[in-house]
């Protein structure tokens, strides 16, 4: 076990990193904290690419379809690491409609392989959903197929399911990580931290908000010195909390919230308040789920954020 370390190392210009399917730069942030100099990123979404550029001002960002991008565009000097998480919706266990190889997103791992094969970084980190471990194309397991492809182009490969809450993130989200290197190093995944960051440690310094409230700029409710180490890390470049937006739910929905304790869900709501549900017993366990303040959050999916309830306030998450 080990303690969380939120300190940022000075980037080493010799350790060049590339982030594919970069989003706003979550993997890149971890890489820079470890001393890697993020030089390039590829992200097709305009808004995500703009966020990445703002977060990593020294990086060159290619905002385009990776399938149309030549790896030579990024291959200007020796690269230490390529990282990325190809689109995962098609592999997700929650996807019951297009969870097969006919989903074009399920072939995007081929693009990651193409860039690694062409650029030949010393290391790569491939991240995806747990569901990929159970996914088959015919009789072949896709995870095994991907790992063997990396081995075929000269990499020593190891993989493991990691939980974000074991490494300083206040959310119990699991992901498959496949890590490889060209030096034959028998890589070991890092040990879990000796504690988990709770929901309260993560958000208790944020403004108190009402149902449907929009507060583009507010004030922290806890002084910096009294905030948790995690909150201090989140606030180190911020003087005020911004873009605090709460989904507006109807009054009868807010009334339901009042009956739900921390860790409880729809099952705590009286039947007379659930009249619009044809069969309440068929509700998913995550519907009307109030988070437990003293523990990491359950997995948060943005498309259903209003179904997760603030641990101390009768509203959805902001």
List the predicted regions and their residue ranges.
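Short alpha-helical segments and helix-capping/turn motifs at coil-helix boundaries
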Residues: 66, 161-165, 283-286
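Bulky hydrophobic/aromatic "packing anchor" residues in well-ordered structure
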Residues: 162, 203, 300-301
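Extracellular/periplasmic catalytic domains that process cell-envelope and extracellular macromolecules
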Residues: 62, 75, 170-172, 291-294
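C-terminal target-recognition/interaction regions appended to catalytic cores
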Residues: 229-318
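Flexible, glycine-/basic-rich loop-and-beta segments that form/coincide
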Residues: 168-224
């Amino acid at each position: 076990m080990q303690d969380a370390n939120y300190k940022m190392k000075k980037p080493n210009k010799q350790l060049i990193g590339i982030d594919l399917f970069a989003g706003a730069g979550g993997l890149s942030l971890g890489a820079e904290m470890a001393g890697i100099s993020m030089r390039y990123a590829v992200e097709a979404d305009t808004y995500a690419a703009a966020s990445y550029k703002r977060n990593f001002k020294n990086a060159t960002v290619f905002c385009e379809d990776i399938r149309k991008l030549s790896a030579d565009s990024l291959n200007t000097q020796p690269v230490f690491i390529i990282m990325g998480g190809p689109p995962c919706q098609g592999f997700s266990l929650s996807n019951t409609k297009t969870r097969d190889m006919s989903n074009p997103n399920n072939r995007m791992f081929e693009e990651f392989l193409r860039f690694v094969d062409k650029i030949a970084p010393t290391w790569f980190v491939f991240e995806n959903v747990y569901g990929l471990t159970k996914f088959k194309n015919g009789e072949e397991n896709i995870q095994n197929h991907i790992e063997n492809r990396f081995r075929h182009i000269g990499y020593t490969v190891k993989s493991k399911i990691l939980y974000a809450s074991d490494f300083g993130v206040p959310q119990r989200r699991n992901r498959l990580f496949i890590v490889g290197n060209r030096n034959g190093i028998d890589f070991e995944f890092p040990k879990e931290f000796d504690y988990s960051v709770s929901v309260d440690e993560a958000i208790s310094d944020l403004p108190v908000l009402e149902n449907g409230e929009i507060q583009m700029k507010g004030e922290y409710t806890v002084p910096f010195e009294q905030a948790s180490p995690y909150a201090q890390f989140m606030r180190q470049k911020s003087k005020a909390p911004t873009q605090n937006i709460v989904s507006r739910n109807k009054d009868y929905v807010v009334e339901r919230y009042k009956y739900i304790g921390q860790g409880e869900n729809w099952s705590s709501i009286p039947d007379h308040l659930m009249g619009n549900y044809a069969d309440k017993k068929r509700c998913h366990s995550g519907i009307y789920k109030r988070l437990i303040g003293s523990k990491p959050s359950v997995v948060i999916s943005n498309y259903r954020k209003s179904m997760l309830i603030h641990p101390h306030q009768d509203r959805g998450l902001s």
